[in-house]
Amino acid sequence: MSDVEQEQIVEEVVVEEQSGAITIEDALKVVLRTSLVHDGLARGLREASKALSKREAQLCVLCDSVTEESIIKLVEALCNEPEEKIPLIKVSDAKLLGEWAGLCQLDRDGNARKVVGASCVVVKNWGADSDERNILLEHFSQQ
């Protein structure tokens, strides 16, 4: 009986360590994957700008390494409209954002192959409520 009690204590400690170690990028990755499953992602500049102008967006993720400066200005302007400001996160790598948004092929081991870069991704539907979503919302409320 004492073995079972010790195992439960160890599991509780592990859960506490994992919840405290989640970074914004890890939370963003999980939120994008959940939103993709629930058909709530707008991937690419055309779909993202439509969702932003219709005010359907909950969150916008923009790539910093875009070569065209007008793309960055357009997305930032659509996110910062005075009626309703949409949270904006900037990511450094387009290929990484494309992989998170599902713009890739997966091999048998689950590794991403043939990743296509994404300049902008918009979350229109969060999907399921999760701890990662709450972490992102707390991050935006602090800013």
UniProtKB/Swiss-Prot annotation:
MF term (GO), any: structural constituent of ribosome
Record-linked PANTHER family: 40S RIBOSOMAL PROTEIN S12
Identification of the protein by name: Small ribosomal subunit protein eS12
Gene that this sequence comes from: RPS12
Source species taxonomy: Eukaryota, Fungi, Dikarya, Ascomycota, Saccharomycotina
Entry annotated with the keyword Nucleotidyltransferase: no
One Gene Ontology cellular component: cytosolic small ribosomal subunit
UniProt keyword Oxidoreductase present: no
Subcellular location: Cytoplasm
Family label: Belongs to the eukaryotic ribosomal protein eS12 family.
BP GO annotations: maintenance of translational fidelity; maturation of SSU-rRNA; ribosomal small subunit assembly; ribosomal small subunit biogenesis
Keywords: Cytoplasm, Ribonucleoprotein, Ribosomal protein
Oligomeric and partner information: Component of the small ribosomal subunit. Mature ribosomes consist of a small (40S) and a large (60S) subunit. The 40S subunit contains about 32 different proteins and 1 molecule of RNA (18S). The 60S subunit contains 45 different proteins and 3 molecules of RNA (25S, 5.8S and 5S).
Function noted in UniProt: Component of the ribosome, a large ribonucleoprotein complex responsible for the synthesis of proteins in the cell. The small ribosomal subunit (SSU) binds messenger RNAs (mRNAs) and translates the encoded message by selecting cognate aminoacyl-transfer RNA (tRNA) molecules. The large subunit (LSU) contains the ribosomal catalytic site termed the peptidyl transferase center (PTC), which catalyzes the formation of peptide bonds, thereby polymerizing the amino acids delivered by tRNAs into a polypeptide chain.
A Pfam family hit: Ribosomal_L7Ae
Main location: cytoplasm
